[in-house]
């Protein structure tokens, strides 16, 4: 065909499988969050919020106590001070596709059902946050310093 698809497929097949860290405290990056309850659902049938993402390291298990960081973020309009309050919850379900899991390991996408108010997880409101064990989470950074330089010219544009 002239598009070198065979070379591309050969290259993809040679990409090494990344090493997985199963021993560190778990960290999962959230790429989706949602409320699985239908409008008008009976109170007895309400479920907690759900977060979807991938585990970076460690293992998550049903029943684990977790924190979601940074959680609720507020900014004082007068002083400009930014504060955050992490959410604490517990894992009540783990799913990959339609499969119920007892535990989840790094790699692939999973859904984590939690004992958390579904309003907190509605409409992807937790995207970019981290799930992990309490007291074993990375620090929250409010400010970062960035050093950059402009390219003198662009090639191929």
Task: Please provide the spans of the model-predicted regions.
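Conserved catalytic-core segments of large NTP-driven translation/proteostasis enzymes
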Residues: 1-154
């Amino acid at each position: 065909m002239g598009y070198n698809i065979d070379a591309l497929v050969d290259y993809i097949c040679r990409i090494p499988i990344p090493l997985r860290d199963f021993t560190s405290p778990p960290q999962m990056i959230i790429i989706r969050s949602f409320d699985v309850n239908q409008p008008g659902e009976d109170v007895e049938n309400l479920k907690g919020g759900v977060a979807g993402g991938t585990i970076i390291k460690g293992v998550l298990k049903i029943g684990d106590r977790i924190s979601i960081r940074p959680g609720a973020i507020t900014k004082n309009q007068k002083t400009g001070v930014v504060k955050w309050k992490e959410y604490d919850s517990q894992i009540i379900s783990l799913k990959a596709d339609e499969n119920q899991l007892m535990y989840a390991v790094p790699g692939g996408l999973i859904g984590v059902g939690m004992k958390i108010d579904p309003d907190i997880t509605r409409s992807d409101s937790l995207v970019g946050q981290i799930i992990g064990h309490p007291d074993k989470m990375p620090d929250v950074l409010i400010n970062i310093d960035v050093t950059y330089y402009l390219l003198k010219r662009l090639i191929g544009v």
